[in-house]
């Protein structure tokens, strides 16, 4: 019975994860020596920093809505497993 309840949420969780990963900017393939972690950076002051523009296919409200849905589904899964 519990497995059936959990399986109901699985497709929705997978879809949300796929959409969320499409919102994350993809890193270009670079040699290991040239990755951003190996290159020291001087960060600007917060007042000088420019905010990156969100990708066209994913607005800020899109990720907020998905985060709310994932949080709700996680609560349901937690409640379903804690009841048994």
Swiss-Prot record:
Keyword Signal: yes
Membrane topology: Lipid-anchor
Signal sequence, renumbered to the chain: 1-22
Superkingdom in the source lineage: Bacteria
PROSITE patterns the record matches: PROKAR_LIPOPROTEIN
Chief subcellular location: membrane
Keywords: Cell membrane, Lipoprotein, Membrane, Palmitate, Signal
Note: Entirely encoded within the coding gene for rzpQ (AC P76158), on the same strand within another reading frame.
The protein, known as: Putative lipoprotein RzoQ
Organism: Escherichia coli (strain K12)
Gene field: rzoQ
């Amino acid at each position: 019975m519990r497995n059936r309840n959990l399986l109901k949420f699985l497709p929705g969780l997978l879809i949300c994860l796929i959409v969320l990963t499409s919102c994350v900017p993809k890193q270009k393939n670079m040699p290991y020596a040239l990755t951003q972690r190996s290159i020291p950076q001087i960060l600007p002051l917060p007042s000088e920093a420019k905010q990156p523009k969100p990708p066209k296919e994913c607005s800020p409200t899109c990720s907020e809505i998905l985060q709310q849905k994932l949080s709700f589904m996680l609560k349901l899964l937690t409640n379903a497993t804690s009841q048994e």
